Amino acid sequence: MIERVPHDLEAYVARSTAPGCFICRMLAGEPDFEHEIIAQDDAHIAFLSRWPPLPGYALAAPKAHLEGVVRDFDDAGYLAMMAFVRRLALAVEAVLGPERTYLLSLGSRQGNSHVHWHVAGLPAGVPYREQQFHALMTEHGIVPTTRESQAALARELAAAMR
């Protein structure tokens, strides 16, 4: 059973659809958009979700503001991005030992438009009815975290990505 607490979806939607890109604002160092960074290189960044529906829920994005998950990358850039996502997913698997790892790209031109991939490890033992889309929906609550627990997890994941 995954411990979850209610998530204020209305506040999240308002924040997600407000002007400005959350990833670009995070990269610019704006305090309201701070996330625990796992790893980064010249072109990519991996970080923990501030509202994780599953333990260790991480995101990976290009540093450049791209919006088309396929069309805005050239072949080399897309393959490099996918290699970075794979490294993050392997780190999630090494640290958290999930039953299954979900990879998906979400976002919309209406909000969270900066291309990013979600890397979510499904803990072992989650009943089938609570897996897949159900497990990813914050409407079912989010995993409670602290700044300290997120920082420690980011360090573990960073070590596993090396």
Predicted regions located by residue number:
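HIT superfamily nucleotide-processing domains
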Residues: M1-R162
